[in-house]
Amino acid sequence: MVQFGSRANTNMTGLPTEQAVEDRRVGNPKRDRMRNALVIVLGEFCGTFMFLLLSFIGAQTALVTNSPSDAGSPLLPFSLMYIAASFGTALAVNVWIFYRVSGGMFNPAVTLGLVLVGAVTPIHALLIIPTQLVAAITAAGITDALLPGKLLVTNALGNGTSVAQGVFIEMFLTSQLVLTVYFLAVEKHRSTHLAPIGIGISVFIAHICATNWTGTSINPARSFGPSVVAGFHGYDWIYYIGPFMGSLLAFGCYKIFKVLEYQTANPGQDDDNLDRSGHHHFFGHRKEPMPHTHTDNIEPKDHGVPQRNDSVIDDQMV
């Protein structure tokens, strides 16, 4: 490892040698890999923690005000909306913050989905998923410590929902979330930078649909954290198996569209010849040329946002 200031890497003046400067510029691949892994782990911990802390506090607030005289009563419409908004907006804002750091996954089912398409390496996934689980436990524990009363945000079946029904509800809703990630974040286009909004909306509508039936997990970490703090049910496995089944279902659907080269079926939609800027194509599928549009003269960078003309700005400042 290069150490600036050592005799081997400095000249008579005490300044770094040209070789030392070049080594620092090129970098140490092993050290860089370790640093990147650390950044990803820290990003996933911070993002998962903040997402779930805000979500748990919002959900706890809705649950304690839902029907104080009957804690087991079905959610009232305003309570349901409150919970859905808490999870959806908390996820959207934290994905927007951390997607450049770690990818903003915060969900083992999403991580599995990204591993399946090659967007996340299996080695990174082995670091990320335990980090997400620890962050979820931490968020649940702090929520329990901050707010009075019993922690109520554990997932549970309700209104006569069977275990089998719960598994498939979680599977289909998670598949919707993972497909949202695939087509808005993995597939690069001019609105990729708005993917956090779509992902948040997907979680919002999932909670509208399923909270009265399964409590809405769609995220094994979200279920695991509160269960560790407040206690497990006998059927907690449905909140782990269901979302992972949803990831597999979404991958199968996405794979079919990629094999069929879906881009050629409805050409020109959200497309500005992004192949020139390194459009990501998984599985090595070829993309047919698309007709030119009036925006083809814009060189898309940073998710399709045109670069500002710094020379013009500099001239104006002189």
UniProtKB/Swiss-Prot annotation:
GO-annotated molecular function: water channel activity
Biased segments, Polar residues type: 1-16
Keywords: Glycoprotein, Membrane, Nucleus, Repeat, Transmembrane, Transmembrane helix, Transport
Record's subcellular location: Nucleus membrane
Sequence intervals crossing the membrane: 37-57, 78-98, 109-129, 166-186, 194-214, 237-257
Membrane topology according to the record: Multi-pass membrane protein
Stretches for region Disordered: 1-27, 268-318
InterPro entries according to UniProt: Aquaporin-like, Aquaporin_transptr, MIP
Record field: compositional bias (Basic and acidic residues): 285-305
Glycosylated residues (UniProt): N159
Cytoplasmic compartment segments: 1-36, 99-108, 187-193, 258-318
Consequence of gene loss (knockout): Leads to whitish colonies with longer aerial hyphae and reduced conidiation and perithecium formation, with morphologically abnormal conidia that undergo abnormal germination. Increases the conidium autophagy. Results in a significant higher production of deoxynivalenol (DON) but does not affect pathogenicity. Exhibits increased resistance to osmotic and oxidative stress as well as cell-wall perturbing agents.
GO cellular component terms, A-Z: nuclear membrane; plasma membrane
Main location: nucleus
Catalytic activity field: H2O(in) = H2O(out)
Short sequence motif NPA 2: positions: 219-221
Sequence motif NPA 1, residues: 107-109
Extracellular topology ranges: 58-77, 130-165, 215-236
Role: Probable water channel involved in responses to changes in environmental conditions and conidiation. Involved in responses to hyperosmotic conditions, oxidative stress and cell wall destabilization. Also required for proper transcriptional activation of genes involved in aurofusarin biosynthesis. Not involved in pathogenicity, but negatively regulates deoxynivalenol (DON) production.
Domain comment quoted from the record: Aquaporins contain two tandem repeats each containing three membrane-spanning domains and a pore-forming loop with the signature motif Asn-Pro-Ala (NPA).
PANTHER family, per the entry: AQUAPORIN TRANSPORTER, MIP17260P
Family that this chain belongs to: Belongs to the MIP/aquaporin (TC 1.A.8) family.
Protein name: Aquaporin-1
Primary gene name: FgAQP1
